[in-house]
């Protein structure tokens, strides 16, 4: 259903639709020794500590034009962090309303617009490593849940830029219903056919993307994987010049196998690569 400013839908009471964006990013690297793996985990833990994550979520809140009611943040031992922000709505300025219903990438934090009520933003981090293979991964799980007119997809552009991930999985769903003035139920209040429409072209050219959408259920799923692979970008503490060719090939295989398994959500046997 298309909503536009010139032909507004008249609602009965408040817009009761709940819109939720789940954004998961993965960073993958290879650390040669146990000490290197521990150093990577410590580096990631510091890079994405509770204070840094709070800064990112605060910028998300500004982008969608909300007021912060409460912030709860926590760093964990031995690693990981989480932040939860409760937010409430800001009034929408008339000249900004048109931007709220467009199926286009959202702004970066310099531009502030949106509308929220009874909503929350959360992030949790999950650093880990393989006990034997030298592979280390970091996952950040961000949920932006809103009630009202604006879609949390407006924050997606900024989140993509904030993490520059190797792999991303994004889920968007709309739940509940609101009513027009005749009492007719509305189960979605904006046009959408893909989450990809909210990702800028310069980002889309860098990733291979797959959509799995269930339109009749208002469920949209997109996963992305970097096209370009440069081994130097995945080595922690040294470069490929420090490795023998045979070792480079072995590490490249391990990294690509790890990325395949994360992207497709299943384990692959070695025979798959022969």
UniProtKB/Swiss-Prot annotation:
Chain positions with Pyruvic acid (Ser) modification: 119
Residues at the active site: 119, 124, 147
Cofactor: pyruvate
Reaction equation(s) it catalyzes: S-adenosyl-L-methionine + H(+) = S-adenosyl 3-(methylsulfanyl)propylamine + CO2
One Gene Ontology term, aspect cellular component: cytosol
GO MF, one example: adenosylmethionine decarboxylase activity
Post-translational modification: Is synthesized initially as an inactive proenzyme. Formation of the active enzyme involves a self-maturation process in which the active site pyruvoyl group is generated from an internal serine residue via an autocatalytic post-translational modification. Two non-identical subunits are generated from the proenzyme in this reaction, and the pyruvate is formed at the N-terminus of the alpha chain, which is derived from the carboxyl end of the proenzyme.
Pfam families to which the protein is assigned, alphabetical: AdoMet_dc
One GO term (biological process): spermidine biosynthetic process
UniProt keyword S-adenosyl-L-methionine present: yes
Protein's pathway: Amine and polyamine biosynthesis; S-adenosylmethioninamine biosynthesis; S-adenosylmethioninamine from S-adenosyl-L-methionine: step 1/1
Swiss-Prot/TrEMBL keywords: Autocatalytic cleavage, Decarboxylase, Lyase, Polyamine biosynthesis, Pyruvate, S-adenosyl-L-methionine, Schiff base, Spermidine biosynthesis, Zymogen
Annotated site residues (Cleavage (non-hydrolytic)) in this chain: 118-119
Enzyme Commission no: 4.1.1.50
Cofactor comment text: Binds 1 pyruvoyl group covalently per subunit.
Highest taxon in the source lineage: Bacteria
Description of how the protein assembles with itself and partners: Heterooctamer of four alpha and four beta chains arranged as a tetramer of alpha/beta heterodimers.
Purpose of the protein: Catalyzes the decarboxylation of S-adenosylmethionine to S-adenosylmethioninamine (dcAdoMet), the propylamine donor required for the synthesis of the polyamines spermine and spermidine from the diamine putrescine.
Family: Belongs to the prokaryotic AdoMetDC family. Type 2 subfamily.
Protein name: S-adenosylmethionine decarboxylase proenzyme
Organism field: Clostridium acetobutylicum (strain ATCC 824 / DSM 792 / JCM 1419 / IAM 19013 / LMG 5710 / NBRC 13948 / NRRL B-527 / VKM B-1787 / 2291 / W)
